[in-house]
Amino acid sequence: MILNRQKRVRVALPPLEKFARRVGRELGLDGRDVSICLVSDAEMARLNKSFRGKQGPTDVLSFPSSEEAASRRASSKSIGDIAIAPMVARRNAKRYGRTLPDELRILILHGVLHLMGYDHERDSGQMERRERLLRRRLDLE
């Protein structure tokens, strides 16, 4: 399920919901739920400060529902929540020469990998390699 809690960027939700289900199938998460919320830059900055101690908005934040979910062992139906800032995504899309829908799909994939326990800041490139492979498989490259 995707909730749009921002008003600055127009986003078509059904294609993103379809993509999120496809990511779940690719990663073996059938029957598991991920909640995705599109938030304003101000809300993302607040979340980024509260949970990471960093100033300003970021593009995506992931909140695993439990430690077990983060380490891929949970039996819970929900693996967690993802917050995405479409304004940041739009700026990044322009910078990287992508469309906004593609950038949002990349952020969904990135967020789900974090929910599964991947951590690009600590895993010696494991998450980056997995994400690159999945981007090719999901026609994002």
What positions do the PLM features span?
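Conserved SAM/SAH cofactor-binding pocket of Class I
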Residues: 106
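An acidic/histidine-cluster motif and surrounding catalytic segment
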Residues: 1-102, 113-141
